[in-house]
UniProtKB/Swiss-Prot annotation:
Protein name per the record: Uncharacterized protein HI_1625
TM region positions: 7-24
Keywords linked to the UniProt accession: Membrane, Transmembrane, Transmembrane helix
PANTHER family in alphabetical order: ERAD-ASSOCIATED E3 UBIQUITIN-PROTEIN LIGASE COMPONENT HRD3, SEL-1-LIKE PROTEIN
Protein's organism: Haemophilus influenzae (strain ATCC 51907 / DSM 11121 / KW20 / Rd)
Gene Ontology cellular component terms for the protein in this record: membrane
Subcellular location: Membrane
Membrane topology: Single-pass membrane protein
InterPro entries: Sel1-like, Sel1_AlgK, TPR-like_helical_dom_sf
């Protein structure tokens, strides 16, 4: 059961999108609009050029772009383009979440569920996943259904399914 939960958490981490940008000149990225920089970062991510993705996401995150903040948190969380640093991942996920990022909240939930940087706290993870599930986020719904299944609480899964209609 715990192995299945771990598998689903890993699957969630890899399914979270790392958004990106369009041209090839990273040095020009600050002069591009946000969508162009996101497109360029996506091209680099598709090629697994994580340092280039990081170099695009970091300034955007500092500028307050919540998608970039959540993506930067994931780069720190996975150690892509930078050294793995759960503290920085938590900080960037929190920044994004405070500004309304569903992905930021979900990623914080995963950190609480796994105990990465924070003390493992399933109840806190559930609270975060419930907040984003209310926004019809399917990743959060999947995480909650797995937690409820492992806790042998099928009635909560049924209730969640009925609410999502």
């Amino acid at each position: 059961m715990k192995l299945k939960l771990f598998f689903h958490i890993v699957l969630l981490c890899f399914s979270l999108p790392i958004w990106a940008m369009k041209t090839v000149d990273v040095t020009a990225s600050p002069k591009m609009d946000d969508q162009a920089r996101m497109n360029l970062a996506q091209e680099f991510a598709n090629k697994q050029q994580w340092i280039d993705v990081f170099n695009i996401m970091y300034p955007m995150a500092l500028e307050g772009n919540i998608t970039a903040q959540s993506n930067l948190g994931m780069l720190y969380n996975l150690g892509r383009g930078t050294v793995r640093d759960y503290e920085k991942a938590y900080w960037w996920f929190s920044e994004a979440a405070e500004k309304g990022s569903v992905k930021g909240l979900n990623n914080l939930g995963v950190m609480y569920l796994r105990g990465d940087y924070v003390k493992q706290n399933t109840e806190q993870a559930i609270k975060l996943f419930e907040r984003t599930a209310q926004a019809k986020d399917t990743d959060a719904m999947m995480m909650l259904s797995n937690i409820y299944r492992l806790q042998n609480q099928p009635e909560k899964i049924i209730g969640m399914a009925e609410e999502s209609r």
